[in-house]
Amino acid sequence: MVSLNSVGLSGTKKIADIGALAIHGHRNGWGMLNRHPLLGIEFAAYQKIWRLAGVDQIHVNGIQNKFWESDDSVVRSIEACLKPMFGGFSVLPVVSSGQWGGQAPETYRRTKTTDLLYMAGGGIMAHPGGPANGVLALQQAWEGAVNGLSVEQAASQYPAFAQSVKKFGTK
């Protein structure tokens, strides 16, 4: 993982040029670049710059996130990442911001894709049935989302996900 705004463009490019590892770009500090119209850059342009530097994955925040960014902005960011550049290359959007399975239905409904990395550390590790059930709950949530189920419908069908809803449902 490279903290893009700290390492900078030339540092990120150098890291990408050194090895064959996937470069996971974290945009910590993004808020300072985007929260005021006179200070920054839209994510659609921002992610292109980092793609040119060699980033393979980039954070886009998340639906119903813990920060200030609107869901509409997150959706635009995901769409920008998936738009091919230079012969079909895209960058993998990393959905991460207080994620658990409960955001999967809305994320899928709004983006119509599973071509993303869905980071849910707390949603996995804090699951009442332990981390294995946390992973299972996420799988169940996404299966339900792809099948058009609401959170409530998926919870009634999938026991591990139901436990997540009980624990995280108000978050």
Protein language model features and the residues they cover:
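Extended, intrinsically disordered, low-complexity segments
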Residues: 130-171
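Catalytic alpha/beta core domains of metabolic enzymes, predominantly
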Residues: 1-120, 129-133
